[in-house]
Protein backbone atom coordinates (compact mmCIF):
# COMPACT_ATOMS: atom_id res chain seq x y z
CA UNK A 1 0.00 0.00 0.00
CA UNK A 2 2.80 2.46 0.76
CA UNK A 3 1.88 5.73 2.41
CA UNK A 4 -1.86 6.30 2.44
CA UNK A 5 -3.15 9.37 0.66
CA UNK A 6 -4.67 12.15 2.73
CA UNK A 7 -8.46 12.06 3.00
CA UNK A 8 -10.34 15.23 2.13
CA UNK A 9 -14.05 16.05 2.05
CA UNK A 10 -15.80 18.15 -0.56
CA UNK A 11 -19.33 19.43 -0.84
CA UNK A 12 -20.80 20.04 -4.31
CA UNK A 13 -23.12 23.02 -4.64
CA UNK A 14 -25.01 24.72 -7.43
CA UNK A 15 -28.42 25.17 -8.99
CA UNK A 16 -30.74 22.24 -9.56
CA UNK A 17 -30.02 21.90 -13.29
CA UNK A 18 -26.38 22.93 -13.28
CA UNK A 19 -25.26 19.36 -13.93
CA UNK A 20 -23.91 18.66 -10.44
CA UNK A 21 -24.98 15.03 -10.55
CA UNK A 22 -23.51 14.39 -13.96
CA UNK A 23 -20.24 16.08 -13.06
CA UNK A 24 -19.94 14.32 -9.72
CA UNK A 25 -21.07 11.05 -11.26
CA UNK A 26 -18.40 11.42 -13.94
CA UNK A 27 -15.62 11.84 -11.36
CA UNK A 28 -16.82 8.90 -9.27
CA UNK A 29 -17.27 6.85 -12.43
CA UNK A 30 -13.82 7.53 -13.83
CA UNK A 31 -11.70 7.73 -10.67
CA UNK A 32 -13.88 6.18 -8.11
CA UNK A 33 -14.80 3.24 -6.00
CA UNK A 34 -17.49 1.91 -8.29
CA UNK A 35 -16.56 -1.44 -9.78
CA UNK A 36 -17.06 -2.27 -13.46
CA UNK A 37 -19.91 -4.68 -12.72
CA UNK A 38 -22.00 -2.03 -10.99
CA UNK A 39 -21.33 0.43 -13.80
CA UNK A 40 -22.41 -2.07 -16.45
CA UNK A 41 -25.56 -2.79 -14.48
CA UNK A 42 -26.33 0.95 -14.21
CA UNK A 43 -25.66 1.48 -17.93
CA UNK A 44 -27.97 -1.34 -18.86
CA UNK A 45 -30.75 -0.01 -16.61
CA UNK A 46 -30.28 3.53 -17.88
CA UNK A 47 -30.46 2.33 -21.49
CA UNK A 48 -33.58 0.26 -20.81
CA UNK A 49 -35.26 3.30 -19.36
CA UNK A 50 -34.21 5.39 -22.32
CA UNK A 51 -31.88 7.38 -20.13
CA UNK A 52 -28.70 6.53 -21.98
CA UNK A 53 -27.60 10.13 -22.06
CA UNK A 54 -27.97 10.24 -18.34
CA UNK A 55 -25.59 7.55 -17.23
CA UNK A 56 -23.32 9.59 -14.96
CA UNK A 57 -26.19 11.25 -13.16
CA UNK A 58 -27.89 7.86 -13.09
CA UNK A 59 -25.00 6.54 -11.01
CA UNK A 60 -25.60 9.32 -8.54
CA UNK A 61 -29.38 8.92 -8.57
CA UNK A 62 -29.06 5.26 -7.70
CA UNK A 63 -26.75 6.10 -4.83
CA UNK A 64 -29.01 8.92 -3.64
CA UNK A 65 -32.12 6.75 -3.70
CA UNK A 66 -30.33 4.21 -1.56
CA UNK A 67 -29.14 6.92 0.79
CA UNK A 68 -32.65 8.33 1.15
CA UNK A 69 -34.08 4.91 1.93
CA UNK A 70 -31.58 4.75 4.75
CA UNK A 71 -29.68 1.83 3.28
CA UNK A 72 -26.17 2.33 4.50
CA UNK A 73 -24.63 1.93 1.12
CA UNK A 74 -21.07 1.15 0.46
CA UNK A 75 -19.65 4.56 1.11
CA UNK A 76 -16.77 3.91 -1.30
CA UNK A 77 -19.31 4.79 -3.95
CA UNK A 78 -19.10 8.40 -2.84
CA UNK A 79 -15.33 8.46 -3.03
CA UNK A 80 -12.83 9.02 -5.79
CA UNK A 81 -9.09 9.50 -5.98
CA UNK A 82 -6.85 12.23 -7.29
CA UNK A 83 -3.09 11.79 -7.46
CA UNK A 84 -2.76 13.25 -3.94
CA UNK A 85 -6.06 12.66 -2.18
CA UNK A 86 -8.84 10.28 -1.37
CA UNK A 87 -11.86 12.53 -1.89
CA UNK A 88 -15.20 11.90 -0.21
CA UNK A 89 -18.28 13.78 -1.37
CA UNK A 90 -20.03 14.43 1.91
CA UNK A 91 -23.23 15.66 0.38
CA UNK A 92 -24.73 17.18 -2.67
CA UNK A 93 -27.72 19.46 -2.42
CA UNK A 94 -31.01 18.37 -3.82
CA UNK A 95 -30.89 15.97 -0.96
CA UNK A 96 -33.77 17.05 1.30
CA UNK A 97 -31.68 17.58 4.38
CA UNK A 98 -28.69 19.04 2.58
CA UNK A 99 -28.47 22.21 4.63
CA UNK A 100 -28.94 20.39 7.90
CA UNK A 101 -26.38 17.77 6.87
CA UNK A 102 -23.90 20.42 5.92
CA UNK A 103 -24.09 21.89 9.39
CA UNK A 104 -24.50 19.01 11.79
CA UNK A 105 -22.70 17.15 9.05
CA UNK A 106 -20.70 14.09 9.73
CA UNK A 107 -17.76 16.18 8.76
CA UNK A 108 -16.64 19.60 7.80
CA UNK A 109 -16.03 20.01 4.08
CA UNK A 110 -12.48 21.08 3.22
CA UNK A 111 -13.58 22.61 -0.06
CA UNK A 112 -16.79 23.50 -1.87
CA UNK A 113 -17.14 22.83 -5.59
CA UNK A 114 -19.63 25.23 -7.16
CA UNK A 115 -21.07 24.06 -10.48
CA UNK A 116 -22.70 26.68 -12.71
CA UNK A 117 -24.27 25.95 -16.10
CA UNK A 118 -23.04 27.95 -19.09
CA UNK A 119 -26.01 27.13 -21.34
CA UNK A 120 -28.10 29.97 -22.77
CA UNK A 121 -30.31 31.38 -20.01
CA UNK A 122 -29.30 28.62 -17.58
CA UNK A 123 -26.60 30.53 -15.81
CA UNK A 124 -28.88 33.51 -15.29
CA UNK A 125 -31.60 31.31 -13.77
CA UNK A 126 -29.21 29.64 -11.37
CA UNK A 127 -27.67 32.79 -10.07
CA UNK A 128 -30.83 34.92 -9.87
CA UNK A 129 -31.76 36.59 -6.61
CA UNK A 130 -33.68 33.63 -5.27
CA UNK A 131 -31.44 30.99 -6.82
CA UNK A 132 -30.23 28.29 -4.45
CA UNK A 133 -26.67 28.82 -5.62
CA UNK A 134 -26.38 31.99 -3.57
CA UNK A 135 -27.77 30.32 -0.49
CA UNK A 136 -25.48 27.31 -0.71
CA UNK A 137 -22.35 29.37 -1.35
CA UNK A 138 -23.20 31.70 1.52
CA UNK A 139 -23.80 28.73 3.81
CA UNK A 140 -20.54 27.11 2.86
CA UNK A 141 -18.69 30.32 3.63
CA UNK A 142 -20.53 31.02 6.89
CA UNK A 143 -19.83 27.49 8.08
CA UNK A 144 -16.12 27.84 7.56
CA UNK A 145 -15.60 26.18 4.17
CA UNK A 146 -12.97 28.64 3.00
CA UNK A 147 -11.75 26.93 -0.19
CA UNK A 148 -13.77 27.06 -3.39
CA UNK A 149 -13.49 25.67 -6.93
CA UNK A 150 -15.88 26.78 -9.68
CA UNK A 151 -16.76 24.44 -12.55
CA UNK A 152 -18.36 26.29 -15.47
CA UNK A 153 -20.33 23.34 -16.82
CA UNK A 154 -22.17 22.50 -20.07
CA UNK A 155 -19.62 24.38 -22.18
CA UNK A 156 -20.81 22.12 -25.02
CA UNK A 157 -24.21 23.85 -25.01
CA UNK A 158 -23.16 27.51 -25.27
CA UNK A 159 -23.89 29.56 -28.42
CA UNK A 160 -21.66 28.76 -30.33
CA UNK A 161 -20.47 25.62 -28.48
CA UNK A 162 -17.36 26.06 -26.30
CA UNK A 163 -17.61 29.84 -26.45
CA UNK A 164 -14.72 31.69 -24.83
CA UNK A 165 -16.77 34.87 -24.66
CA UNK A 166 -19.57 33.16 -22.71
CA UNK A 167 -17.03 31.56 -20.35
CA UNK A 168 -15.34 34.87 -19.59
CA UNK A 169 -18.68 36.57 -19.03
CA UNK A 170 -19.62 33.91 -16.47
CA UNK A 171 -16.27 34.03 -14.69
CA UNK A 172 -16.70 37.78 -14.31
CA UNK A 173 -20.22 37.45 -12.89
CA UNK A 174 -19.37 34.62 -10.53
CA UNK A 175 -16.26 36.45 -9.29
CA UNK A 176 -18.32 39.49 -8.32
CA UNK A 177 -20.85 37.27 -6.69
CA UNK A 178 -18.53 35.12 -4.58
CA UNK A 179 -16.59 38.22 -3.57
CA UNK A 180 -19.77 39.62 -2.01
CA UNK A 181 -20.09 36.45 0.02
CA UNK A 182 -16.52 36.68 1.28
CA UNK A 183 -14.40 34.50 -1.04
CA UNK A 184 -11.38 36.05 -2.74
CA UNK A 185 -11.66 35.16 -6.47
CA UNK A 186 -7.83 35.10 -6.81
CA UNK A 187 -7.77 32.01 -4.61
CA UNK A 188 -10.50 30.24 -6.62
CA UNK A 189 -9.83 27.94 -9.59
CA UNK A 190 -12.31 28.48 -12.45
CA UNK A 191 -12.51 25.57 -14.91
CA UNK A 192 -14.64 25.40 -18.10
CA UNK A 193 -15.96 21.82 -18.27
CA UNK A 194 -18.52 19.48 -19.72
CA UNK A 195 -19.45 16.93 -17.07
CA UNK A 196 -21.23 14.99 -19.76
CA UNK A 197 -18.63 14.97 -22.56
CA UNK A 198 -15.71 14.99 -20.17
CA UNK A 199 -14.06 18.22 -21.39
CA UNK A 200 -11.43 19.37 -18.86
CA UNK A 201 -12.67 16.87 -16.32
CA UNK A 202 -9.64 14.55 -16.22
CA UNK A 203 -8.00 15.44 -19.53
CA UNK A 204 -7.42 18.84 -21.14
CA UNK A 205 -10.12 19.52 -23.74
CA UNK A 206 -9.31 19.75 -27.44
CA UNK A 207 -12.53 21.76 -27.85
CA UNK A 208 -11.24 24.76 -25.90
CA UNK A 209 -7.77 25.58 -27.26
CA UNK A 210 -8.33 29.15 -26.03
CA UNK A 211 -8.31 28.01 -22.40
CA UNK A 212 -4.82 28.52 -21.06
CA UNK A 213 -5.54 26.91 -17.72
CA UNK A 214 -6.57 28.11 -14.26
CA UNK A 215 -4.35 29.85 -11.71
CA UNK A 216 -4.75 30.55 -8.03
CA UNK A 217 -2.67 32.83 -5.84
CA UNK A 218 -2.71 32.30 -2.11
CA UNK A 219 -0.31 32.77 0.73
CA UNK A 220 0.09 29.03 1.27
CA UNK A 221 1.43 28.57 -2.25
CA UNK A 222 0.21 29.30 -5.76
CA UNK A 223 -1.12 26.63 -8.06
CA UNK A 224 -2.14 26.18 -11.68
CA UNK A 225 -3.52 23.49 -13.94
CA UNK A 226 -6.07 22.77 -16.64
CA UNK A 227 -8.58 20.19 -15.43
CA UNK A 228 -11.11 19.91 -12.63
CA UNK A 229 -9.24 16.90 -11.26
CA UNK A 230 -6.03 18.96 -11.04
CA UNK A 231 -7.94 21.71 -9.23
CA UNK A 232 -9.12 19.15 -6.67
CA UNK A 233 -5.53 18.01 -6.33
CA UNK A 234 -4.51 21.55 -5.38
CA UNK A 235 -6.88 21.85 -2.43
CA UNK A 236 -4.84 22.74 0.65
CA UNK A 237 -4.92 19.74 2.97
CA UNK A 238 -6.85 20.22 6.18
CA UNK A 239 -5.13 20.40 9.52
CA UNK A 240 -6.99 18.01 11.77
CA UNK A 241 -7.44 19.44 15.26
CA UNK A 242 -5.52 16.84 17.29
CA UNK A 243 -3.88 19.51 19.44
CA UNK A 244 -7.18 20.80 20.84
CA UNK A 245 -8.78 19.29 23.95
CA UNK A 246 -11.02 16.28 23.35
CA UNK A 247 -14.62 16.77 22.22
CA UNK A 248 -16.68 13.73 21.26
CA UNK A 249 -20.46 14.21 20.82
CA UNK A 250 -22.31 10.94 21.43
CA UNK A 251 -24.42 9.49 18.63
CA UNK A 252 -25.68 6.51 20.64
CA UNK A 253 -25.06 4.61 23.83
CA UNK A 254 -25.20 0.81 23.77
CA UNK A 255 -25.34 -1.77 26.48
CA UNK A 256 -23.31 -4.75 25.40
CA UNK A 257 -23.54 -7.99 27.34
CA UNK A 258 -20.29 -8.96 29.04
CA UNK A 259 -18.70 -5.60 28.21
CA UNK A 260 -21.00 -2.98 29.66
CA UNK A 261 -21.83 0.53 28.54
CA UNK A 262 -20.43 1.59 25.17
CA UNK A 263 -20.97 5.19 24.03
CA UNK A 264 -20.47 5.70 20.29
CA UNK A 265 -19.58 8.88 18.44
CA UNK A 266 -17.11 10.74 16.34
CA UNK A 267 -13.99 12.38 17.73
CA UNK A 268 -14.34 16.00 16.58
CA UNK A 269 -11.23 17.44 18.26
CA UNK A 270 -8.41 16.05 20.37
CA UNK A 271 -7.47 12.44 21.03
CA UNK A 272 -9.28 9.68 22.92
CA UNK A 273 -7.15 6.97 24.55
CA UNK A 274 -7.80 4.00 26.81
CA UNK A 275 -7.01 4.89 30.43
CA UNK A 276 -8.19 8.48 30.04
CA UNK A 277 -10.61 9.91 32.56
CA UNK A 278 -13.47 11.55 30.65
CA UNK A 279 -16.29 13.84 31.72
CA UNK A 280 -19.65 13.78 29.96
CA UNK A 281 -21.54 17.09 29.72
CA UNK A 282 -24.14 18.33 30.44
CA UNK A 283 -24.83 15.32 32.72
CA UNK A 284 -21.56 15.86 34.57
CA UNK A 285 -20.53 12.20 34.84
CA UNK A 286 -16.82 11.39 35.09
CA UNK A 287 -15.37 7.95 34.45
CA UNK A 288 -12.44 6.02 33.05
CA UNK A 289 -12.22 4.84 29.44
CA UNK A 290 -11.41 1.13 29.47
CA UNK A 291 -11.00 0.53 25.75
CA UNK A 292 -11.58 2.24 22.41
CA UNK A 293 -12.51 0.47 19.20
CA UNK A 294 -13.29 1.22 15.59
CA UNK A 295 -14.72 -1.36 13.14
CA UNK A 296 -14.31 -4.00 15.87
CA UNK A 297 -10.59 -3.38 16.27
CA UNK A 298 -9.03 -2.05 19.46
CA UNK A 299 -7.29 1.31 19.05
CA UNK A 300 -4.47 2.78 21.13
CA UNK A 301 -5.82 6.22 20.22
CA UNK A 302 -8.72 7.71 18.27
CA UNK A 303 -8.16 10.90 16.27
CA UNK A 304 -10.47 13.57 14.84
CA UNK A 305 -12.74 12.07 12.20
CA UNK A 306 -12.72 8.59 13.75
CA UNK A 307 -16.12 7.05 14.53
CA UNK A 308 -15.51 4.97 17.62
CA UNK A 309 -17.15 3.04 20.40
CA UNK A 310 -15.54 3.16 23.83
CA UNK A 311 -16.19 1.14 26.94
CA UNK A 312 -16.71 3.04 30.20
CA UNK A 313 -16.77 1.62 33.71
CA UNK A 314 -19.52 2.00 36.34
CA UNK A 315 -21.77 4.08 34.08
CA UNK A 316 -25.24 2.84 33.19
CA UNK A 317 -27.01 3.42 29.91
CA UNK A 318 -29.34 5.73 31.85
CA UNK A 319 -26.50 8.07 32.84
CA UNK A 320 -25.41 9.23 29.38
CA UNK A 321 -27.27 9.67 26.10
CA UNK A 322 -27.13 10.90 22.51
CA UNK A 323 -26.24 14.61 22.38
CA UNK A 324 -23.98 14.42 25.44
CA UNK A 325 -20.36 15.39 24.85
CA UNK A 326 -17.31 13.57 26.20
CA UNK A 327 -14.08 15.41 26.98
CA UNK A 328 -10.87 15.02 28.98
CA UNK A 329 -11.66 15.68 32.65
CA UNK A 330 -8.26 17.36 33.11
CA UNK A 331 -8.07 19.46 29.95
CA UNK A 332 -10.87 22.00 29.44
CA UNK A 333 -13.66 19.48 30.20
CA UNK A 334 -16.98 20.15 28.44
CA UNK A 335 -19.66 21.89 30.51
CA UNK A 336 -23.36 22.58 30.40
CA UNK A 337 -24.34 25.78 28.56
CA UNK A 338 -26.69 28.01 30.55
CA UNK A 339 -27.11 30.06 27.38
CA UNK A 340 -25.18 31.19 24.31
CA UNK A 341 -24.87 34.07 21.89
CA UNK A 342 -25.06 33.21 18.21
CA UNK A 343 -24.97 34.86 14.83
CA UNK A 344 -27.95 33.51 12.92
CA UNK A 345 -29.05 33.85 9.32
CA UNK A 346 -32.77 33.42 8.65
CA UNK A 347 -33.10 31.41 5.42
CA UNK A 348 -36.74 30.71 4.80
CA UNK A 349 -39.30 31.52 7.40
CA UNK A 350 -42.77 32.45 6.12
CA UNK A 351 -43.47 34.92 8.92
CA UNK A 352 -41.52 36.92 11.45
CA UNK A 353 -39.32 35.64 14.23
CA UNK A 354 -39.40 37.57 17.46
CA UNK A 355 -38.00 37.06 20.96
CA UNK A 356 -39.61 34.00 22.54
CA UNK A 357 -39.44 31.85 19.37
CA UNK A 358 -38.37 28.40 20.58
CA UNK A 359 -37.43 26.04 17.76
CA UNK A 360 -35.31 22.89 18.04
CA UNK A 361 -31.83 23.46 16.63
CA UNK A 362 -29.63 20.57 15.52
CA UNK A 363 -26.16 21.18 16.94
CA UNK A 364 -23.64 18.33 16.63
CA UNK A 365 -25.75 15.35 17.79
CA UNK A 366 -27.91 17.34 20.22
CA UNK A 367 -31.53 18.13 19.39
CA UNK A 368 -32.92 20.36 22.14
CA UNK A 369 -35.41 23.25 22.04
CA UNK A 370 -33.75 26.64 22.52
CA UNK A 371 -35.47 29.95 23.03
CA UNK A 372 -34.47 33.09 21.13
CA UNK A 373 -34.36 35.01 24.44
CA UNK A 374 -33.17 38.33 23.05
CA UNK A 375 -32.65 39.73 19.55
CA UNK A 376 -29.60 41.88 20.24
CA UNK A 377 -28.75 43.37 16.86
CA UNK A 378 -29.47 43.03 13.18
CA UNK A 379 -26.26 42.86 11.13
CA UNK A 380 -25.09 42.88 7.52
CA UNK A 381 -24.63 39.21 6.74
CA UNK A 382 -21.46 39.69 4.74
CA UNK A 383 -19.51 42.29 6.68
CA UNK A 384 -21.02 41.60 10.10
CA UNK A 385 -21.52 45.38 10.60
CA UNK A 386 -24.35 46.37 12.90
CA UNK A 387 -27.47 47.68 11.12
CA UNK A 388 -29.91 48.03 14.01
CA UNK A 389 -29.98 47.57 17.80
CA UNK A 390 -32.64 45.38 19.44
CA UNK A 391 -34.74 44.63 16.33
CA UNK A 392 -38.37 43.76 17.12
CA UNK A 393 -38.42 40.83 14.69
CA UNK A 394 -36.41 39.01 12.01
CA UNK A 395 -37.55 37.80 8.61
CA UNK A 396 -36.07 35.72 5.77
CA UNK A 397 -32.72 37.05 4.61
CA UNK A 398 -31.89 38.78 7.90
CA UNK A 399 -28.75 38.13 9.90
CA UNK A 400 -28.67 38.88 13.61
CA UNK A 401 -26.89 38.40 16.89
CA UNK A 402 -29.22 36.64 19.33
CA UNK A 403 -29.07 35.28 22.87
CA UNK A 404 -30.37 31.73 23.08
CA UNK A 405 -31.37 29.68 26.12
CA UNK A 406 -31.71 25.87 25.97
CA UNK A 407 -34.92 24.42 27.39
CA UNK A 408 -33.06 21.40 28.80
CA UNK A 409 -29.39 20.97 29.74
CA UNK A 410 -27.18 20.89 26.66
CA UNK A 411 -23.50 21.23 25.80
CA UNK A 412 -22.33 23.50 22.98
CA UNK A 413 -19.11 25.44 22.33
CA UNK A 414 -18.13 28.60 20.51
CA UNK A 415 -17.38 28.12 16.81
CA UNK A 416 -13.91 29.62 17.22
CA UNK A 417 -12.93 27.09 19.92
CA UNK A 418 -14.58 23.93 18.62
CA UNK A 419 -16.14 24.47 15.15
CA UNK A 420 -18.21 21.25 14.94
CA UNK A 421 -19.87 22.04 18.27
CA UNK A 422 -20.40 25.69 17.40
CA UNK A 423 -22.66 25.61 14.36
CA UNK A 424 -26.32 24.67 14.21
CA UNK A 425 -29.32 24.42 11.92
CA UNK A 426 -32.85 25.37 12.96
CA UNK A 427 -35.47 23.09 11.41
CA UNK A 428 -39.11 24.06 11.58
CA UNK A 429 -42.07 23.27 9.33
CA UNK A 430 -40.04 20.55 7.60
CA UNK A 431 -37.36 22.90 6.34
CA UNK A 432 -34.22 24.61 7.54
CA UNK A 433 -35.39 28.05 8.62
CA UNK A 434 -32.09 29.36 9.99
CA UNK A 435 -28.44 28.54 10.50
CA UNK A 436 -26.23 29.82 13.25
CA UNK A 437 -22.67 30.09 14.42
CA UNK A 438 -22.08 30.31 18.18
CA UNK A 439 -20.04 33.34 19.25
CA UNK A 440 -19.91 32.86 23.03
CA UNK A 441 -21.16 30.37 25.61
CA UNK A 442 -22.24 31.09 29.16
CA UNK A 443 -20.98 27.95 30.88
CA UNK A 444 -22.69 26.70 33.99
CA UNK A 445 -20.28 25.98 36.81
CA UNK A 446 -20.89 22.30 37.41
CA UNK A 447 -21.82 21.17 40.89
CA UNK A 448 -20.38 17.93 42.20
CA UNK A 449 -21.36 15.44 39.56
CA UNK A 450 -21.11 11.68 39.55
CA UNK A 451 -17.49 10.52 39.65
CA UNK A 452 -17.26 6.75 39.32
CA UNK A 453 -15.03 4.59 41.49
CA UNK A 454 -12.82 3.70 38.56
CA UNK A 455 -12.31 7.39 37.79
CA UNK A 456 -11.30 8.08 41.40
CA UNK A 457 -8.85 5.19 41.27
CA UNK A 458 -7.41 6.30 37.95
CA UNK A 459 -7.03 9.86 39.23
CA UNK A 460 -5.30 8.68 42.44
CA UNK A 461 -2.94 6.43 40.52
CA UNK A 462 -1.61 9.34 38.47
UniProtKB/Swiss-Prot annotation:
Enzyme class of the recorded protein, top EC level: hydrolase
Region described as G4: 153-156
Example of a GO biological process term: cellular response to epidermal growth factor stimulus
- Cite a GO CC annotation: nucleolus
On this chain, the residues bearing N6-succinyllysine are 392
Where N6,N6-dimethyllysine occurs, the residues are 36, 55, 165
Q: Which CDD domains match?
A: EF1_alpha, EF1_alpha_II, EF1_alpha_III
Residues bound to GTP:
14-21, 153-156, 194-196
Compartmental location: Cytoplasm; Nucleus; Nucleus, Nucleolus; Cell membrane
User: Can you name one GO molecular function term for this protein?
Assistant: kinase activator activity
Q: Which residues carry this modification: Phosphoserine?
A: 300
Q: What is its EC number?
A: 3.6.5.-
Q: Does the keyword Electron transport apply?
A: no
Annotated protein name in UniProt = Elongation factor 1-alpha 1
- Organism the protein comes from: Equus caballus
Designated gene of the protein: EEF1A1
Amino acid sequence: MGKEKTHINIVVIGHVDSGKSTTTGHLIYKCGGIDKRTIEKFEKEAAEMGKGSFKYAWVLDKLKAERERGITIDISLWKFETSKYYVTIIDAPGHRDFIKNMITGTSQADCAVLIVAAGVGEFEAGISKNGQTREHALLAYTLGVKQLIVGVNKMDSTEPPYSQKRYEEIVKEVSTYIKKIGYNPDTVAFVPISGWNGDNMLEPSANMPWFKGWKVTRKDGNASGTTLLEALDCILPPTRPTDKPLRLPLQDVYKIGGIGTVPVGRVETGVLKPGMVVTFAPVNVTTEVKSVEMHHEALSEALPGDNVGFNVKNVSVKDVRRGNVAGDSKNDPPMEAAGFTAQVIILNHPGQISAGYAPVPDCHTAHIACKFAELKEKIDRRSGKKLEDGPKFLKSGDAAIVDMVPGKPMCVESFSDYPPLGRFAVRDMRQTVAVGVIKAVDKKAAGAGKVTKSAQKAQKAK
